[in-house]
Amino acid sequence: MDTDRVIFSTQWIAVRESSQGFQYLERNGKDSVAVFLLRKSGENPAQYDVLIRHQHLCIDNQEVNGRLKLFPCPITGALDEGESSEAAAIREVFEETGYRVQVLPLGKYVVGTQVNEVCYLYYANVTGIVPDEAQEDGTYLESIGRNEWHPFNYLEMCEYSACQIGFFKLRKILFQES
């Protein structure tokens, strides 16, 4: 894909055209991670909460009471140049939540047919871990995001594709479903 022609670019994105004439979007950093943080939520060993990051998305973003509408997502972020997906997942979790974790792989998916991005999915159980203060990356969009714990099944009703994929993959792991 490095030989594909750049039609338009900014410091954040490029629109490219392949030798077959297919045009697609490539964002700086290209690939991304989505991380699901879980904690036990009661006596039942099969009861979990999931940390949801409410953040800005580029679509359907009306202001509500003078504030941008936020959408439920897992912890997400782009891979830095030369960074592994696992290292990016650990870094993003610390930046956005303050948790220091080791992550477990959950799979990956192609984000869409009009972009060349792969999203790597991870999860970590943070039951009993006390987080440090979230570092954030200094951007306005990250500063308006917020984290909230919800029952695990909350993921099923989130519209963000990583939430849907994560819900079904995690349900298999956590509840030993086939």
Where in the sequence are the language-model features?
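Glycine-rich adenosyl-nucleotide cofactor-binding module
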Residues: 46-90
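Long hydrophobic alpha-helical segments typical of transmembrane helices together
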Residues: 155-178
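A short, structural micro-pattern
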Residues: 12, 29, 68, 115-116
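Unchanged
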Residues: 33, 72-163
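Residues embedded in well-ordered beta-strands
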Residues: 34-36, 49-51, 121
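A short, polar/proline- and glycine-enriched secondary-structure boundary/capping micro-motif
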Residues: 32-37, 61-66, 142-145
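Acidic, metal-coordinating catalytic segment for phosphate/diphosphate chemistry
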Residues: 2-44, 58
